[in-house]
Protein backbone atom coordinates (compact mmCIF):
# COMPACT_ATOMS: atom_id res chain seq x y z
CA UNK A 1 0.00 0.00 0.00
CA UNK A 2 1.49 3.35 -1.05
CA UNK A 3 0.58 6.87 0.06
CA UNK A 4 -1.52 9.15 -2.15
CA UNK A 5 -3.02 12.21 -0.45
CA UNK A 6 -4.88 13.37 -3.56
CA UNK A 7 -7.89 11.19 -2.71
CA UNK A 8 -9.51 9.51 0.31
CA UNK A 9 -7.79 6.47 1.75
CA UNK A 10 -8.96 3.03 0.70
CA UNK A 11 -7.06 0.94 3.24
CA UNK A 12 -8.65 -0.07 6.50
CA UNK A 13 -7.31 0.50 10.01
CA UNK A 14 -6.03 -1.59 12.88
CA UNK A 15 -8.44 -1.59 15.83
CA UNK A 16 -7.51 -1.16 19.49
CA UNK A 17 -5.74 1.19 21.90
CA UNK A 18 -1.95 0.76 22.36
CA UNK A 19 -2.09 -2.78 21.03
CA UNK A 20 0.95 -4.69 19.80
CA UNK A 21 0.30 -4.18 16.10
CA UNK A 22 2.13 -5.74 13.14
CA UNK A 23 1.54 -4.57 9.57
CA UNK A 24 3.38 -4.67 6.25
CA UNK A 25 2.79 -3.01 2.89
CA UNK A 26 4.77 -5.71 1.05
CA UNK A 27 4.43 -9.42 1.86
CA UNK A 28 7.24 -10.64 4.05
CA UNK A 29 8.62 -7.18 4.83
CA UNK A 30 8.41 -7.85 8.57
CA UNK A 31 11.33 -9.99 9.79
CA UNK A 32 10.22 -13.25 11.32
CA UNK A 33 11.04 -13.91 14.96
CA UNK A 34 13.46 -11.02 15.50
CA UNK A 35 13.63 -7.21 15.35
CA UNK A 36 16.96 -6.43 13.72
CA UNK A 37 18.19 -9.21 11.43
CA UNK A 38 21.58 -8.94 9.80
CA UNK A 39 19.82 -8.19 6.53
CA UNK A 40 16.21 -7.03 6.63
CA UNK A 41 13.83 -8.12 3.82
CA UNK A 42 13.74 -6.06 0.60
CA UNK A 43 16.98 -4.29 1.55
CA UNK A 44 15.19 -2.28 4.26
CA UNK A 45 16.75 -0.74 7.36
CA UNK A 46 15.52 -1.70 10.84
CA UNK A 47 14.98 1.25 13.20
CA UNK A 48 13.44 1.39 16.66
CA UNK A 49 11.33 4.40 17.70
CA UNK A 50 11.09 4.65 21.51
CA UNK A 51 8.29 6.65 23.13
CA UNK A 52 9.18 5.71 26.71
CA UNK A 53 12.32 4.74 28.61
CA UNK A 54 13.76 1.31 27.80
CA UNK A 55 13.14 0.25 31.40
CA UNK A 56 9.56 1.51 31.73
CA UNK A 57 7.26 -1.20 33.15
CA UNK A 58 5.93 -3.50 30.46
CA UNK A 59 2.39 -2.17 30.80
CA UNK A 60 3.61 1.38 30.13
CA UNK A 61 6.43 0.69 27.68
CA UNK A 62 5.85 2.12 24.20
CA UNK A 63 8.07 1.46 21.20
CA UNK A 64 7.81 0.35 17.60
CA UNK A 65 10.19 -1.22 15.10
CA UNK A 66 10.16 0.36 11.65
CA UNK A 67 11.48 -1.25 8.45
CA UNK A 68 12.24 1.58 6.09
CA UNK A 69 13.97 2.42 2.83
CA UNK A 70 16.42 4.83 4.53
CA UNK A 71 17.10 5.48 8.23
CA UNK A 72 15.69 8.63 9.81
CA UNK A 73 19.25 9.95 10.25
CA UNK A 74 19.61 10.60 6.50
CA UNK A 75 19.11 14.35 6.01
CA UNK A 76 21.18 17.53 5.85
CA UNK A 77 21.93 19.55 9.03
CA UNK A 78 19.08 21.52 10.61
CA UNK A 79 19.01 25.31 10.68
CA UNK A 80 16.49 27.72 12.24
CA UNK A 81 13.18 27.91 10.38
CA UNK A 82 11.96 31.42 9.59
CA UNK A 83 8.23 30.63 9.50
CA UNK A 84 5.63 29.87 12.19
CA UNK A 85 6.91 32.43 14.70
CA UNK A 86 3.86 32.21 16.99
CA UNK A 87 4.76 28.99 18.82
CA UNK A 88 5.57 28.85 22.55
CA UNK A 89 6.73 25.83 24.56
CA UNK A 90 8.15 27.37 27.77
CA UNK A 91 5.55 28.86 30.10
CA UNK A 92 7.54 30.71 32.72
CA UNK A 93 7.48 34.53 32.73
CA UNK A 94 8.95 35.68 29.43
CA UNK A 95 8.39 38.02 26.52
CA UNK A 96 5.98 35.43 25.11
CA UNK A 97 4.12 34.69 28.36
CA UNK A 98 2.95 37.69 30.43
CA UNK A 99 1.55 37.50 33.99
CA UNK A 100 -1.59 35.35 33.96
CA UNK A 101 -4.77 37.28 34.85
CA UNK A 102 -7.50 35.62 36.95
CA UNK A 103 -10.13 36.87 34.50
CA UNK A 104 -12.37 34.50 32.59
CA UNK A 105 -11.24 34.63 28.95
CA UNK A 106 -13.02 33.80 25.70
CA UNK A 107 -12.02 34.07 22.05
CA UNK A 108 -13.75 34.17 18.69
CA UNK A 109 -12.47 31.68 16.07
CA UNK A 110 -9.26 32.32 14.15
CA UNK A 111 -10.18 34.03 10.87
CA UNK A 112 -9.75 31.96 7.75
CA UNK A 113 -6.68 32.94 5.77
CA UNK A 114 -6.23 34.69 2.43
CA UNK A 115 -2.52 34.00 1.91
CA UNK A 116 -1.63 30.37 1.10
CA UNK A 117 -0.72 28.78 4.45
CA UNK A 118 -0.13 25.14 5.33
CA UNK A 119 -0.62 23.27 8.60
CA UNK A 120 2.82 24.12 10.02
CA UNK A 121 2.76 27.83 9.20
CA UNK A 122 -0.85 28.07 10.41
CA UNK A 123 -0.01 27.12 14.00
CA UNK A 124 -0.33 29.61 16.87
CA UNK A 125 0.05 28.94 20.60
CA UNK A 126 -2.79 30.22 22.75
CA UNK A 127 -1.74 28.96 26.18
CA UNK A 128 0.01 26.22 28.09
CA UNK A 129 1.99 25.25 31.16
CA UNK A 130 5.19 23.54 32.13
CA UNK A 131 8.14 23.10 29.84
CA UNK A 132 8.87 21.16 26.69
CA UNK A 133 12.52 20.89 27.74
CA UNK A 134 11.55 19.39 31.11
CA UNK A 135 8.96 17.11 29.49
CA UNK A 136 6.05 18.22 31.66
CA UNK A 137 2.88 20.18 30.97
CA UNK A 138 1.41 21.04 27.60
CA UNK A 139 0.95 23.71 24.94
CA UNK A 140 -2.45 24.50 23.46
CA UNK A 141 -2.31 25.59 19.84
CA UNK A 142 -4.85 26.59 17.23
CA UNK A 143 -4.35 26.02 13.53
CA UNK A 144 -5.84 27.70 10.47
CA UNK A 145 -4.65 26.61 7.04
CA UNK A 146 -5.77 26.64 3.42
CA UNK A 147 -2.99 24.77 1.59
CA UNK A 148 -1.71 21.22 1.75
CA UNK A 149 1.89 20.66 2.82
CA UNK A 150 3.90 20.46 -0.39
CA UNK A 151 7.08 18.36 -0.33
CA UNK A 152 7.61 19.14 3.34
CA UNK A 153 7.24 17.05 6.46
CA UNK A 154 6.95 17.87 10.15
CA UNK A 155 7.55 16.28 13.52
CA UNK A 156 7.52 17.46 17.12
CA UNK A 157 10.22 16.24 19.49
CA UNK A 158 8.50 18.21 22.26
CA UNK A 159 5.37 16.11 22.69
CA UNK A 160 2.52 14.09 21.25
CA UNK A 161 -0.05 16.08 19.29
CA UNK A 162 -3.75 15.65 20.09
CA UNK A 163 -5.45 17.22 17.06
CA UNK A 164 -9.13 18.24 17.18
CA UNK A 165 -10.36 19.37 13.73
CA UNK A 166 -13.21 21.89 13.79
CA UNK A 167 -13.52 22.73 10.09
CA UNK A 168 -12.21 20.75 7.12
CA UNK A 169 -10.88 17.24 6.82
CA UNK A 170 -7.21 16.38 7.33
CA UNK A 171 -5.49 13.69 5.28
CA UNK A 172 -2.48 12.91 7.48
CA UNK A 173 0.28 10.80 5.93
CA UNK A 174 2.63 9.48 8.62
CA UNK A 175 5.60 7.15 8.75
CA UNK A 176 3.20 4.46 10.01
CA UNK A 177 0.56 4.93 7.33
CA UNK A 178 -2.34 7.24 6.75
CA UNK A 179 -5.07 8.76 8.92
CA UNK A 180 -8.07 10.50 7.35
CA UNK A 181 -9.61 12.70 10.05
CA UNK A 182 -12.75 14.82 9.91
CA UNK A 183 -14.50 17.12 12.39
CA UNK A 184 -16.00 15.04 15.25
CA UNK A 185 -12.86 12.87 15.13
CA UNK A 186 -9.49 13.36 16.81
CA UNK A 187 -6.00 12.25 15.85
CA UNK A 188 -2.97 11.66 18.07
CA UNK A 189 0.50 11.86 16.51
CA UNK A 190 3.19 10.54 18.88
CA UNK A 191 6.29 12.51 19.73
CA UNK A 192 8.87 12.21 16.95
CA UNK A 193 6.61 10.76 14.25
CA UNK A 194 7.08 12.49 10.89
CA UNK A 195 4.00 13.42 8.91
CA UNK A 196 2.45 15.65 6.24
CA UNK A 197 -1.06 17.13 6.15
CA UNK A 198 -3.22 17.54 3.04
CA UNK A 199 -6.40 19.63 3.08
CA UNK A 200 -8.98 18.07 0.72
CA UNK A 201 -11.60 20.70 1.59
CA UNK A 202 -9.35 23.75 1.28
CA UNK A 203 -9.87 25.78 4.46
CA UNK A 204 -9.16 23.93 7.70
CA UNK A 205 -9.22 25.01 11.31
CA UNK A 206 -8.93 23.29 14.68
CA UNK A 207 -7.25 22.82 18.02
CA UNK A 208 -4.14 20.98 19.23
CA UNK A 209 -3.02 19.96 22.70
CA UNK A 210 0.70 19.20 22.61
CA UNK A 211 1.37 16.90 25.55
CA UNK A 212 4.93 17.27 26.86
CA UNK A 213 4.63 14.64 29.61
CA UNK A 214 3.41 11.08 30.16
CA UNK A 215 1.60 9.59 27.18
CA UNK A 216 -2.15 9.84 26.81
CA UNK A 217 -4.02 6.74 27.95
CA UNK A 218 -7.55 5.51 28.49
CA UNK A 219 -8.85 6.21 32.00
CA UNK A 220 -9.71 3.44 34.44
CA UNK A 221 -13.46 2.93 34.66
CA UNK A 222 -13.81 2.08 38.36
CA UNK A 223 -17.43 1.32 39.35
CA UNK A 224 -18.63 2.07 35.80
CA UNK A 225 -17.41 -1.45 35.06
CA UNK A 226 -15.67 -3.06 32.11
CA UNK A 227 -17.33 -1.01 29.34
CA UNK A 228 -18.17 2.62 28.73
CA UNK A 229 -16.78 6.04 27.85
CA UNK A 230 -14.26 5.63 24.98
CA UNK A 231 -14.06 1.93 24.16
CA UNK A 232 -10.61 0.62 23.11
CA UNK A 233 -11.88 -1.11 19.95
CA UNK A 234 -12.93 2.24 18.47
CA UNK A 235 -9.39 3.63 18.34
CA UNK A 236 -7.91 3.14 14.87
CA UNK A 237 -4.24 2.94 13.88
CA UNK A 238 -3.07 3.04 10.24
CA UNK A 239 -1.88 0.05 8.29
CA UNK A 240 1.62 0.29 6.85
CA UNK A 241 1.88 2.41 3.71
CA UNK A 242 4.91 4.06 2.17
CA UNK A 243 6.17 6.27 -0.61
CA UNK A 244 9.50 5.86 -2.40
CA UNK A 245 10.13 9.37 -3.71
CA UNK A 246 13.39 11.20 -4.29
CA UNK A 247 13.79 14.93 -4.82
CA UNK A 248 14.14 18.24 -2.98
CA UNK A 249 12.13 17.94 0.24
CA UNK A 250 12.06 19.88 3.51
CA UNK A 251 11.91 18.40 7.01
CA UNK A 252 10.60 20.71 9.78
CA UNK A 253 11.42 19.75 13.38
CA UNK A 254 10.02 21.25 16.58
CA UNK A 255 12.49 21.01 19.47
CA UNK A 256 12.32 22.98 22.72
CA UNK A 257 9.65 25.22 21.24
CA UNK A 258 11.72 26.23 18.22
CA UNK A 259 11.21 25.18 14.62
CA UNK A 260 14.16 23.96 12.57
CA UNK A 261 14.41 22.98 8.91
CA UNK A 262 16.64 20.56 7.01
CA UNK A 263 16.95 19.59 3.38
CA UNK A 264 16.21 15.94 2.74
CA UNK A 265 16.62 14.17 -0.60
CA UNK A 266 13.77 11.70 -0.19
CA UNK A 267 10.38 11.36 1.44
CA UNK A 268 10.77 10.26 5.08
CA UNK A 269 7.42 8.44 4.81
CA UNK A 270 9.25 5.36 3.55
CA UNK A 271 8.34 2.79 6.20
CA UNK A 272 7.32 -0.41 4.39
CA UNK A 273 6.47 -2.40 7.52
CA UNK A 274 6.30 -1.87 11.27
CA UNK A 275 5.34 -3.57 14.50
CA UNK A 276 4.89 -2.27 18.03
CA UNK A 277 2.61 -0.22 20.26
CA UNK A 278 3.87 3.34 19.66
CA UNK A 279 1.94 4.65 16.67
CA UNK A 280 -0.53 7.33 15.53
CA UNK A 281 -4.24 6.75 16.02
CA UNK A 282 -7.61 8.37 15.54
CA UNK A 283 -10.95 8.18 17.36
CA UNK A 284 -14.49 9.15 16.42
CA UNK A 285 -15.97 11.20 19.27
CA UNK A 286 -19.48 10.23 18.14
CA UNK A 287 -18.76 6.71 19.42
CA UNK A 288 -18.24 7.90 23.01
CA UNK A 289 -20.54 6.04 25.42
CA UNK A 290 -21.82 8.90 27.56
CA UNK A 291 -22.58 8.23 31.22
CA UNK A 292 -25.00 10.39 33.22
CA UNK A 293 -27.41 10.56 36.14
CA UNK A 294 -30.83 8.92 35.86
CA UNK A 295 -32.01 10.12 39.27
CA UNK A 296 -30.86 13.59 40.36
CA UNK A 297 -27.92 16.00 40.20
CA UNK A 298 -25.38 16.64 37.46
CA UNK A 299 -22.30 14.43 38.02
CA UNK A 300 -18.79 15.82 37.88
CA UNK A 301 -17.46 16.32 34.31
CA UNK A 302 -14.93 13.52 34.83
CA UNK A 303 -17.70 11.22 33.50
CA UNK A 304 -16.92 12.71 30.07
CA UNK A 305 -13.21 11.80 30.13
CA UNK A 306 -11.85 10.43 26.84
CA UNK A 307 -8.07 10.40 27.41
CA UNK A 308 -5.77 11.31 30.27
CA UNK A 309 -2.07 11.92 30.86
CA UNK A 310 -1.24 10.81 34.37
CA UNK A 311 1.00 12.62 36.84
CA UNK A 312 3.09 11.25 39.70
CA UNK A 313 0.14 11.86 42.07
CA UNK A 314 -2.51 9.10 41.98
CA UNK A 315 -5.87 10.39 40.77
CA UNK A 316 -4.44 13.70 39.56
CA UNK A 317 -3.73 14.03 35.84
CA UNK A 318 -1.49 16.50 34.05
CA UNK A 319 -4.01 16.59 31.17
CA UNK A 320 -7.60 15.42 30.87
CA UNK A 321 -9.30 15.48 27.47
CA UNK A 322 -13.04 15.73 28.09
CA UNK A 323 -15.94 16.05 25.64
CA UNK A 324 -19.54 17.21 25.98
CA UNK A 325 -21.35 15.26 23.25
CA UNK A 326 -25.05 14.86 22.44
CA UNK A 327 -26.76 13.21 25.43
CA UNK A 328 -30.04 12.76 27.24
CA UNK A 329 -30.67 14.65 30.49
CA UNK A 330 -33.21 12.95 32.73
CA UNK A 331 -32.44 14.06 36.30
CA UNK A 332 -35.54 15.35 38.13
CA UNK A 333 -35.66 18.45 40.31
CA UNK A 334 -32.15 19.18 39.10
CA UNK A 335 -30.43 22.13 37.47
CA UNK A 336 -29.44 20.25 34.35
CA UNK A 337 -26.76 22.41 32.65
CA UNK A 338 -23.23 22.38 34.07
CA UNK A 339 -23.36 24.13 37.43
CA UNK A 340 -21.50 27.18 38.70
CA UNK A 341 -17.98 26.16 39.54
CA UNK A 342 -14.57 27.11 40.86
CA UNK A 343 -11.91 24.51 40.18
CA UNK A 344 -8.43 23.80 41.51
CA UNK A 345 -7.70 22.62 37.96
CA UNK A 346 -7.65 24.93 34.93
CA UNK A 347 -9.99 24.51 31.97
CA UNK A 348 -9.46 25.39 28.29
CA UNK A 349 -12.58 24.74 26.22
CA UNK A 350 -13.31 24.57 22.51
CA UNK A 351 -16.39 23.95 20.41
CA UNK A 352 -16.39 21.74 17.32
CA UNK A 353 -20.07 22.02 16.45
CA UNK A 354 -23.35 23.52 17.60
CA UNK A 355 -23.77 25.27 20.94
CA UNK A 356 -22.60 24.52 24.47
CA UNK A 357 -25.48 23.95 26.88
CA UNK A 358 -24.08 26.30 29.55
CA UNK A 359 -23.66 29.27 27.20
CA UNK A 360 -26.55 30.50 25.07
CA UNK A 361 -24.53 33.08 23.12
CA UNK A 362 -20.94 34.07 22.36
CA UNK A 363 -19.24 30.67 22.44
CA UNK A 364 -19.19 29.60 18.79
CA UNK A 365 -17.60 26.73 16.83
CA UNK A 366 -13.88 27.39 16.43
CA UNK A 367 -13.85 29.66 19.47
CA UNK A 368 -12.26 28.97 22.84
CA UNK A 369 -12.49 29.88 26.50
CA UNK A 370 -10.13 29.69 29.47
CA UNK A 371 -11.19 29.46 33.12
CA UNK A 372 -8.09 29.21 35.25
CA UNK A 373 -7.60 27.92 38.77
CA UNK A 374 -10.37 29.26 41.08
CA UNK A 375 -11.84 31.60 38.46
CA UNK A 376 -15.62 31.45 38.86
CA UNK A 377 -17.53 30.23 35.82
CA UNK A 378 -20.77 28.55 34.85
CA UNK A 379 -23.98 29.15 32.90
CA UNK A 380 -24.76 32.62 31.65
CA UNK A 381 -27.77 34.56 32.96
CA UNK A 382 -30.17 33.50 30.22
CA UNK A 383 -29.27 29.81 30.51
CA UNK A 384 -29.70 29.91 34.30
CA UNK A 385 -33.16 31.46 34.13
CA UNK A 386 -34.41 29.03 31.49
CA UNK A 387 -32.98 25.93 33.19
CA UNK A 388 -34.33 27.00 36.58
CA UNK A 389 -37.87 27.12 35.17
CA UNK A 390 -37.79 24.09 32.87
CA UNK A 391 -39.95 20.99 33.35
CA UNK A 392 -37.60 18.31 34.72
CA UNK A 393 -40.27 15.60 34.82
CA UNK A 394 -39.51 15.01 31.15
CA UNK A 395 -36.15 13.96 29.70
CA UNK A 396 -34.43 16.39 27.36
CA UNK A 397 -31.85 15.67 24.67
CA UNK A 398 -28.89 17.98 24.21
CA UNK A 399 -28.38 17.47 20.49
CA UNK A 400 -26.30 18.80 17.59
CA UNK A 401 -23.31 19.72 19.74
CA UNK A 402 -19.71 18.74 20.40
CA UNK A 403 -17.74 20.74 22.94
CA UNK A 404 -14.49 19.65 24.58
CA UNK A 405 -12.09 20.63 27.32
CA UNK A 406 -8.37 20.35 27.98
CA UNK A 407 -8.14 20.33 31.79
CA UNK A 408 -4.78 20.53 33.56
CA UNK A 409 -3.68 20.38 37.17
CA UNK A 410 -1.43 23.43 36.79
CA UNK A 411 -2.22 26.96 35.69
CA UNK A 412 -2.86 27.39 31.95
CA UNK A 413 -0.94 30.52 31.00
CA UNK A 414 -2.18 32.49 27.96
CA UNK A 415 0.47 33.82 25.60
CA UNK A 416 0.94 37.44 24.58
CA UNK A 417 -0.72 36.55 21.29
CA UNK A 418 -3.80 35.22 23.08
CA UNK A 419 -4.14 38.32 25.28
CA UNK A 420 -3.49 40.81 22.48
CA UNK A 421 -5.41 39.25 19.58
CA UNK A 422 -8.50 40.93 18.18
CA UNK A 423 -10.34 37.62 18.72
CA UNK A 424 -10.27 38.08 22.52
CA UNK A 425 -13.80 38.97 23.69
CA UNK A 426 -13.33 41.96 25.99
CA UNK A 427 -16.97 41.76 27.10
CA UNK A 428 -17.04 38.08 28.08
CA UNK A 429 -17.60 38.96 31.75
CA UNK A 430 -20.90 40.60 30.80
CA UNK A 431 -22.60 37.21 30.34
CA UNK A 432 -22.81 36.89 34.14
CA UNK A 433 -23.66 40.49 34.99
CA UNK A 434 -27.35 39.95 34.29
CA UNK A 435 -27.65 37.22 36.92
CA UNK A 436 -30.40 38.31 39.29
CA UNK A 437 -30.56 38.29 43.04
CA UNK A 438 -33.30 35.82 44.06
CA UNK A 439 -32.47 35.61 47.76
CA UNK A 440 -35.39 36.22 50.13
CA UNK A 441 -34.90 35.28 53.81
CA UNK A 442 -38.70 35.28 54.27
CA UNK A 443 -39.38 32.71 51.55
CA UNK A 444 -37.78 29.28 51.45
Curated annotation (Swiss-Prot):
- This protein's record includes keyword Cell membrane: no
Instruction: Give the intrachain disulfide bonds.
Output: none
Q: What Gene3D superfamilies does this protein's entry cite?
A: Jelly Rolls
Report any Pfam family annotated for this entry. HgmA_N
Task: Decide whether keyword Metal-binding is in the record.
Answer: yes
What GO terms in the biological process aspect are recorded for it? L-phenylalanine catabolic process; tyrosine catabolic process
Recorded GO MF terms? homogentisate 1,2-dioxygenase activity; iron ion binding
Q: Which cofactor does it need?
A: Fe cation
Residue sites binding homogentisate per the record: 356, 377
List ligand-binding residues for Fe cation.
341, 347, 377
Q: Which HAMAP family match?
A: Homogentis_dioxygen
Provide the assembly information. Hexamer; dimer of trimers.
Q: What is this protein called?
A: Homogentisate 1,2-dioxygenase
Organism per entry: Burkholderia orbicola (strain MC0-3)
